Amino acid sequence: MSKESSFDIVSKVDLSEVANAINIAMKEIKTRYDFKGSKSDISLEKDELVLISDDEFKLEQLKDVLIGKLIKRGVATKNIQYGKIEPAAGGTVRQRAKLVQGIDKENAKKITTIIKNTGLKVKSQVQDDQIRVSGKSKDDLQKVIAAIREADLPIEVQFVNYR
């Protein structure tokens, strides 16, 4: 009479926390002496960060400040993919960073392989940008979660919808 238990594996970035981290980082940048008179800016456009600064060195410092604030706000920095540094208007440089939302096919395959390699009696289904894992034993599901947490994945994953 045991019914199936399940959970979902997702990869999401909380955009409101990202916006909060950007605001806090910009406040710090405006008060820092080494950024006095610079044209440094961080903005959020849909699911993309845009970092602008005077030169590459200041851009790297800007990125370090932002990453520190994102970590304090609990945002996974693994889910940020930085683009190339490109020249922008007014002698500044720009870098775009994409916020990865959801699990792509390649990472879904890696995760399902990890689940299969555990040898437990669980089923995994890829559903769009998430993975549903189901099984009769809650202990098996917890072992799957532990195995996925131990794995070195290129994205940060969360576990939701325990049933």
UniProtKB/Swiss-Prot annotation:
Claim: Protein transport is one of the keywords in the record: no
Q: Which UniProt keywords apply?
A: Nucleotide-binding
| InterPro entries referenced in this protein's UniProt entry, alphabetically | DUF520, UPF0234-like_C, UPF0234_N, YajQ-like_sf
Please provide one cellular component term from the Gene Ontology annotations of this protein.
Answer: cytosol
Q: Which HAMAP family match?
A: YajQ
> NCBIfam families this protein is in?
PRK05412.1
Q: What is this protein called?
A: Nucleotide-binding protein GK0742
